[in-house]
């Protein structure tokens, strides 16, 4: 009998398909510090952040940044990890006067959380510098969706009335107190079940602020977070960014942009076509949004109360969503037909326009009970 390999004629090799893994967490804080050597990241001489520069425990972080040599950085890292912070990257030798909006822009999109450690005497100056960077980013037309970041700062000025997007403020006498906010967000996994919750009332490991009702009212009106003793523990009161947006929801919205982008890029490389491709796009978006419903980010009891939304594409008007439509899934996806594409769109191989409306969760922060005694 001959010994010819049968694979010369019929060659079959069916393997188990392994799906691309897309992470539901963005759990790494980038901490710039005035201490250390410029050009070092987490103790390593490098300009790029790799897994080697990501510190995943207090033991690892304090070994590189001991209190004797790096007292300020150590204090910040201690606050982060004692409040269950997940992971951190430390970029050395960058004081508040050195940090720029371009530095943040150069960070990978997966690094959403940003803080800066300055000397104790410069806390308010650093706070002002961070607000300026956040304001610069807010007006940068190239920053939206996937490349947004949340910047954290600490102040002892309750009357800060500035309204700033993606800037989280904490009123505290405690050095590094803003790290509590970053630590909380770092623990959110959008692919979990009921893992997205309001930051308000979170118990934290930090010294409390003793507040008068008038002071709390001022902080609340100015969307400044504060830790005080409440309901048997030291807890955060506030839960918002400086523009009044919910801190948790804003963070998860950025992650949503990123994971949905990843899913659609994953779909694109399969070389989808025409009408069949449109169906796959719709299915991919809906499947990903289901994860955000499961984790608690999306609410299923909201209704589109605005006027009916319409758009005009390729000379024809299309209805996206009608007034009074309930968002029973927490989201509403509308994909326009192929006829909505212009000739130029077709030549560019574009998919038809897709509209996504989401209803984020509303965290209840106050309860009023009325009644009568008879």
Model regions and ranges:
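Small-residue-rich
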Residues: 1-151, 232
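A glycine- and small-residue-enriched flexible loop/hinge signal that marks low-structured segments
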Residues: 39, 45, 101-270, 281, ...
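Structured, hydrophobic secondary-structure cores that serve as assembly/anchoring elements
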Residues: 1-49, 56, 233-374
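Extended, compositionally biased low-complexity polar/Lys-Gly-rich tracts
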Residues: 51-94, 140-160, 171-178, 187, ...
